[in-house]
Every structure is written in C-alpha cells, then in structure tokens.
C-alpha cells in the first residue's frame, strides 16, 4: 500500500516529506512514481529502498543527461569558489546566480541517481488497494518523460510539470502544440475535480485553462517579436506580461519565447539547451525588470 509521486530535490527535503506523510500513513510506501526526469522530482528516489519505482521508458537515460548530481555539485562549487566564482561571474553571471541559489536552498550531498525500476510506454494502470490509478505518458511537453497520474474514481489528477500554477513554466523539450493537446485532454476528457500541479497550489480545471492561455499568449507575442527581427532575450525584456505579471518567476519567460523562436525557425523540438547561455539570459531579463532571478 501507499504511493508517492515524485521525491523532492534533495535528501533533506525528501526526508522531511517522508516524516510528514508518516503522520497519516504508518509504513513506507511500496510504490513511487516519477512524473518526469528532472532532478527536483527524482533526487529522493534512493530513500525508498525496496519500493517499486515507476516511470516512462525514457527516464533512465534522460536522468543521466539532465539529473546528474555531480554536475550540480560542480556548478555550486564553482559558483562559490573565491577565484573561480569571481571569474565565472564575469563571463556567466546567470550561471553563478543559479549555482549560489541552489547552494542556499538545497543540499545535494550524498545523492545517488536511482532510476525507475518499472518502465512503461504509453499507459500503465495499477490498483492501489481499492483505488484505480492510471499513469499516462503525455510528453514531450515540459520534458520527454512527462506523465500524468489520474485517479478516475476520486477525480484527482497529479499533473507533474505539465502544469505550473500561478508560476511561470519552463519547457525544456517538446512543442507548444503537444502541450496544448495535453492541457485540452485534461480539461475536455479527464475533467478532474482536483489537480495537483508540479509547481504551485492545488486547483481545478481552471488551472489547465489558464496555463494554456498563458502559453498561447506567449507564443503569439513571440511571433510578433520574431517577425520584427528581435532576439529572444530582447523580446523577453520587452514583452508585456499582461495578466501574468503576478506569476512567480516571470523572468523564465525567456525560455518560452526561445522555444517559440525555435519552432518558427523549424529547429528540432529536442535541440539541447546551452545551460550557461540560458541562465545568463534569464538573469539579464530579471535585472532588466528589476527583480531577483529564480532558477
């Protein structure tokens, strides 16, 4: 019995989560589901020893590419080193800011990358005691392995990072159209009463509707900037955020504009991101808007 969906960004936060749900469940869960491959959803996997860990078939290889704890630790050490940090900031101020923020918020020591042990392709249906659980692959929207966890009887949906609530999304791999299709499926087919987003507070289907409206707005505005010949970074500094100005982390809009630009240029949807350049652009957008960047 018992199932955990995603396992936090580091071991201290994962242990805190285990302690919290220990108040309502007497034993460690026997199942874990990773909604996708990003580090903030899988870095606590190792604490669930003996549990069945479920994820899309792409996750083991994708985790090696995007969730290597050694790389994150190296970034933090470089950002905080007196000489290295100073020199790195001259070249990549955003990368240094990201490394220092991660160091303040998380402790990545002792993390071992533990991939899912049960892999699925399109859909996996399991029984959790008397509750039916559908795990549905919908990626790539935010990432390759995006999966929804749907409980039809309870009408509860765990959306992973397919849905950010009142928080600017970041799309690493995928297309706008794929993301639109998935959000439409949530609203028109699943019709959940409660949605647990990957980031942000609980919501109903209005969260998916708002998310789609945001993405449509950004793509349309990006088209206008693209046609005028502005670079994505320039567009991110100039765009009117309109009704989304109060969303957290508005500077991340750079990634969403750059994703739109890639589509306009007919570039591959899985083209790798230059992490240093991306964080630097996010940093510059934040500075231009007079806010502290959040990575």
Residues covered by each model-derived region:
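Divalent metal-coordination and catalytic microenvironments
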Residues: 6, 21, 36, 48, ...
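Active-site neighborhood of phospho(di)ester-bond hydrolases with catalytic His/Asp-centered motifs
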Residues: 5-7, 28-38, 54-56, 138, ...
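Active-site-proximal loop/helix segments of hydrolase catalytic cores
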Residues: 132-189
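Active-site metal-binding motif and surrounding structural segment of the metallo-beta-lactamase
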Residues: 12-55, 191
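Conserved beta-strand hairpin/beta-sheet module of binuclear metal-dependent hydrolase folds
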Residues: 1-23, 147-160
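Divalent-metal (often Zn2+) His-rich catalytic cores of metallo-beta-lactamase-fold enzymes
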Residues: 177-242
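C-terminal regulatory/interaction regions
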Residues: 228-295
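Metallo-beta-lactamase
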Residues: 64-137, 183
């Amino acid at each position: 019995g018992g199932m955990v969906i995603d396992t936090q960004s580091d071991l201290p936060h994962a242990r805190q989560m285990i302690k919290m749900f220990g108040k309502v469940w007497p034993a460690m869960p026997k199942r874990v589901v990773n909604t996708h491959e990003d580090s903030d959803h899988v870095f606590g996997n190792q604490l669930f020893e003996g549990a069945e860990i479920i994820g899309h078939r792409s996750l083991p290889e994708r985790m090696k590419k995007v969730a290597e704890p050694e790389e994150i630790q190296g970034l933090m050490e470089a950002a905080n080193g007196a000489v290295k940090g100073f020199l790195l900031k001259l070249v990549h101020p955003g990368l240094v800011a990201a490394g220092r923020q991660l160091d303040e918020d998380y402790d990545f020591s002792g993390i071992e990358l533990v991939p899912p042990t049960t892999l699925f392709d399109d859909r996996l249906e399991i029984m959790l005691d008397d509750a039916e659980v559908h795990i549905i692959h919908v990626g790539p929207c935010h990432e390759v392995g995006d999966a929804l966890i749907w409980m039809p009887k309870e009408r509860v949906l765990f959306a992973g990072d397919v849905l950010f609530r009142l928080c600017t999304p970041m799309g690493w791999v995928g297309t706008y159209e794929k993301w639109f299709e998935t959000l439409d499926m949530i609203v028109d087919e699943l019709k959940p009463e409660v949605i647990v987003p990957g980031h942000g507070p609980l919501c109903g289907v209005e969260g998916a509707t708002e998310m789609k409206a945001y993405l449509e707005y950004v793509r349309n505005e990006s088209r206008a900037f693209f046609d005028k010949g502005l670079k994505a970074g320039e567009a991110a500094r100039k765009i009117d955020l309109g009704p989304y100005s109060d969303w957290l982390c508005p500077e991340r809009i750079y990634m969403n504009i750059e994703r739109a630009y890639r589509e306009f240029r007919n570039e591959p949807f899985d083209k790798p991101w230059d992490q240093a350049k991306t964080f630097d652009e996010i940093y510059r957008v934040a500075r231009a808007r007079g806010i502290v960047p959040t990575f």
